[in-house]
A protein has these predicted regions:
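A short, conserved structural fragment
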Residues: 52-61
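Basic amphipathic alpha-helical segments that dock to polyanions
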Residues: 14, 33, 44-52
């Protein structure tokens, strides 16, 4: 969990969404991403073009897949999200609020802070 800081929030959100969709089902389409993120098809098309050019995703027909680099990055983002969510729940935040806050905080909290949260959760 070390590289997420150099990517922008939009990339993180799209890759995390694709990662989670792929965990749910083996075939993911652009429309699935649009629905999950509550964004337009045009926004997804633009993001997929950008992510493809950067080597994070590829498409086989109409199906989306993460490259090894994209998968590693998405896993790091998701791990950060889970650590923050779990930390917030541990200190008494409701599960729904912890999930919502983690979505926002994952883009702002430093690597050092996430590591400290992770260590705290191990106690």
């Amino acid at each position: 969990m070390n590289t997420y800081a150099k990517y922008n929030q939009s990339e993180q959100d799209y890759l995390e969404s694709i990662f989670l969709l792929l965990k749910e089902k083996s075939i993911v389409h652009r429309i699935d991403v649009a629905k999950k993120m509550s964004v337009s098809q045009a926004a997804v098309n633009k993001a997929m073009k950008n992510l493809s050019e950067k080597g994070y995703i590829y498409e086989d027909g109409k199906h989306l897949y993460l490259t090894e680099t994209g998968k590693k990055y998405a896993e790091e983002v998701y791990e950060k999200h889970c650590i923050i969510r779990d930390f917030l729940q541990k200190i008494g935040v409701s599960p729904a609020k912890a999930e919502d806050d983690a979505c926002h905080m994952e883009h702002l909290v430093s690597h050092e802070t996430v590591l400290a949260m992770k260590q705290f959760l191990k106690r």
